Amino acid sequence: MSTARTLLLRRASWLAPLALLLAACGGGSEGASTTTPSTGLSVIAAIGDQIFHDTSLSASRRMACASCHDPAHGHSSASADAVVPAGGPGMATPGFRKAPSLNYLNLTPAFFFDAEGTPTGGLTRDGKADSLRAQAATPFLSAHEMANGDLPAVVARLRIASYAEDFRSLFGANIFDDPDAAFDRARVALQAYQLEAREFHPYDSKYDQFLAGRVALSARELQGLALFNSPAKGNCAACHPSARGADGSPPLFTDFTYDNLGVPRNPAIAANADPAYFDLGLCGPFRTDLANRADLCGAFKVPTLRNVAVTAPYFHNGRFKTLKEAVSFYVRRDTHPEEWYPRTADGSVRKFDDLPPQYHRNVNTTEAPYNRTPGQAPALSAEEIDLVVEFLATLTDGYQP
């Protein structure tokens, strides 16, 4: 079976249950698919919109989904200075990872291993959620996010929300008497909102308009695109395909796989004060089903590069505050490791310092531009790095000619 066919089936595997549930919903005069005039969304998606922006659903009453997923930043975190906004009951509990963009997740397949054993798909940095519905459960109960003590606590807040009556009308008058069902329906509503609202997948960047023949890229942007695509230069398109799909669909700039890049440790993450703590992505600590796969330790999901110019800081740990820094790291990590990693007492560079030594072998050192050593020239010059960064800026949604 082709990779494209496999991905299509995987995507359908988590969209089909949603369609069945939506068909079954409707406790009042309006069904789940009825469009609400004020939003253009179905009733269930409009409820999801309200849940997404509702700070009263958190223990602090100051955090909502939108707090870490700002539409002006590709539905990622808004601050380049904070890895993730502090949460918890007092809004002082530090997080562990940079909040990823929620844009363009509608076509992400559920997690699977392909025919060659490559981990692919799934949501979040480690792919542990197979759908937007599943992913939505974590922030409500996470101690460093919305920090509800348990599922009934979330539902108790839903019961008194301003849209509670709409929730009852859609899901049944007694829905809040069953916390499991009510919490699940809230997650279904959040998923429906993210699938329906165009702001999560507008395809209106300058690059999209370039592909449609409506605008031209500048000479420098075209040079950056060529460097981005070239296997001998940036080789970015190897994991972030830039061409239309075989069916003419616009590129998502991710192949949904995972990679271990050996990103430097970020001292701004409070947990990193403990030298024994490591975020190992696919094999833990937040995902546990692959804990025995030592070969996957340190691998994180390849993100879409759409809106990358407005989603700083970069990488799973938010180590780099600017896009130029992030691109420079890719092409200079192996030729100039002293620029990125600390030195030991004897002056040697402690490369891959955010991984235990036994997992250093997992870091990608074979593909371009990583397949170089100190003393060799980087795959991209400083000027070429600037050109790639200029091209990446064309992937920001909302372009106005």
Where are the regions that the model predicts?
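Short glycine/threonine-rich turn/loop motifs
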Residues: E30-Q135, P202-R343
